[in-house]
Amino acid sequence: MIFPIFFTFFLLLSTSHASVQDFCVADYKAPDGPAGYSCKKPAIVTVNDFVYSGLGIAGNTTNIFKAAVTPAFAAQFPGVNGLGISLARLDLGPGGVVPFHTHPGASEVLLVVQGTIIAGFVASDNTPYLKTLKKGDIIVFPQGLLHFQVNGGDTPAIAFPSFSSPSPGLQIVDFALFKNDLATELIAQTTLLDAPQIKKLKGVLGGTN
């Protein structure tokens, strides 16, 4: 029962782009630009362009964050190109976490379908909003705001995030700071973290300098 309610809610909230065409299926043979993919010629569009089956498979959570995201964005699901919507699957193993991150191009609605997830975001005035979510609960993350998810139980958790863009974008704060070649001294000055801790995080996440 929860899935019909969720998808009806999702479709009502989403905003599609007005167009003289019924759809703009992504043409992966053409370059991807700021406005998205070019449209495939309608004559070669098939029903398979509007169907994606990848979200029924659990993601691999054997990583440092014990988390996996399986996207159904325009890059994977050509039928959502130009429609202002997309979907993904989130798997969190016990102790799993999606660290603070932001989607510059979209708001997000997260539906929990298994387990317990602690989820929240931080507003631009630095006020935190967080809640422990159970099966059937949803939370919205406004566009561009930092947010996170943590498995709040001792069993695997599954959620389906939906987005108000076919290409929501992603920036993870930990990666932005520590998975690059930005000098440790600069990071220490701008974050007040100790240099040894910064070097440790760079080592874990693959950064240098």
Curated annotation (Swiss-Prot):
Tagged with keyword Secreted: yes
Biological processes annotated in GO: auxin-activated signaling pathway
Q: Where in the cell is it found?
A: Secreted, Extracellular space, Apoplast; Secreted, Cell wall
Determine if Secreted is one of this entry's keywords. yes
The secretion signal range is: 1-18
Instruction: State where Mn(2+) binds.
Output: H101, H103, E108, H147
**Alphabetized GO MF terms:** manganese ion binding
For this record, an example GO cellular component is:
apoplast
Protein family (similarity comment): Belongs to the germin family.
Q: What does this protein do?
A: Probable receptor for the plant growth-promoting hormone auxin.
Subunit structure, interactors included = Interacts with ABP20.
PANTHER family assigned: GERMIN-LIKE PROTEIN SUBFAMILY 3 MEMBER 3 (PTHR31238)
Annotated protein name in UniProt = Auxin-binding protein ABP19b
